[in-house]
Design a protein with these regions (language model features):
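Structural motif
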Residues: 3-7, 34-37, 69-70, 97-99, ...
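Gly/Ser/Thr/Ala-enriched C-terminal appendages of enzymes
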Residues: 90-92, 97, 105-294
């Protein structure tokens, strides 16, 4: 996937040597340009950090450039230990030494550590990143939205439910993302019928699909539109060129910048609205009225 790989050594590396210092020295000899030492195998502040400092001093005296070096904390009170370790490293003359932290970190722990003033410069996130721990499954079911009539036109269909959020949106549809023109931030996503065309120089009316009394009117010229859906398969043939992992990452980072700060906050975030066009809303209400009359 052309993704750069980096990391440190394991506790087993330390334990395979007679003592911690010898293990650190051997690792530094092998990786002098990427010397990140795991300091919590025995005692972080009494032996781990002092032994790491000893190795760094020896590298410095030997004329080895200290380009990328530091320590990793993998247990204990990371806020407290990082502050103590930072003080020890600074006093020893290594103010640019990296302090990396790991140990089942997620976005909430990282945010908490930052609030506590933890002296951590690098975050190692593994388990929570690769396992989708907070949401391990994606709930999705097939629902019919439209059938093609004999004349070639789609006939919209709707499914009702005791749960409002499970009532489907009828018809053959497409999706636009609406951006506020002034800020470039996302205003809402718009679900509309596949044949609808919009003019950014005309006002637009949006309907909340769950709370239809909530309407948003966008003034003409105040927004821009981008269609989100692209063809992947046409007539059984794949017509989509999958981008590289790095391009996907770049796209994701770019799109994240279009979210409002209130949407990106970890606690009680504001939501991105997904609305219906006036035409789709009218069809949905019409079908609901028909179903309730039967």
């Amino acid at each position: 996937f052309d993704v750069p790989v980096s990391g440190t050594h394991a506790h087993s590396w330390i334990m395979s040597f007679p003592d911690e210092y010898t293990a650190f020295k051997a690792y530094a000899d092998i990786y002098p340009n990427a010397c990140l030492l795991l300091v919590d195998t025995y005692d972080t502040l009494k032996s781990g950090v002092p032994n790491a400092i000893r190795v760094f001093q020896e590298m410095k005296e030997a004329g080895i450039p200290l380009t990328k070096y530091g320590i990793r904390l993998d247990s204990g009170d990371l806020a407290y230990l990082s502050k103590k370790a930072r003080k020890m490293l600074d006093e020893a003359g290594f103010p640019d030494a990296i302090i990396s932290a790991s140990n089942d970190l997620d976005e909430f722990l990282i945010d908490s550590l930052k609030v506590q003033g933890a002296a951590i410069t690098s975050w190692g996130v593994g388990t929570h990143l690769i396992t989708s721990k907070d949401c391990p499954s994606f709930g999705g079911v097939y629902k019919l939205a439209a059938v093609m009539g004999k004349d070639g036109n789609f006939i919209p269909k709707i499914k009702l439910s005791e749960n409002t959020e499970k009532v489907t949106n009828p018809g053959n549809k497409k999706i636009y993302r609406i951006y506020e023109k002034e800020s470039g931030k996302i205003k809402a996503d718009l679900i509309c019928l596949a044949d609808e065309v919009f003019d950014e120089n005309e006002p637009m009316l949006l309907f909340d699909p769950l709370e239809p009394w909530k309407k948003t009117k966008l003034p003409a010229g105040s927004y821009t539109l981008r269609e989100l859906m692209v063809p992947v398969f046409l007539n059984g043939e794949c017509v989509y060129d999958s981008p590289s992992v790095m391009k996907i990452r770049d796209y994701s980072k770019k799109e994240l910048e279009t979210l409002w700060p209130e949407t990106r906050r970890l606690v009680n975030p504001h939501k991105v609205y997904v609305d219906l066009s006036a035409k789709l809303y009218d069809i949905k209400i019409s079908l609901l009225d028909q179903m309730s009359a039967e």
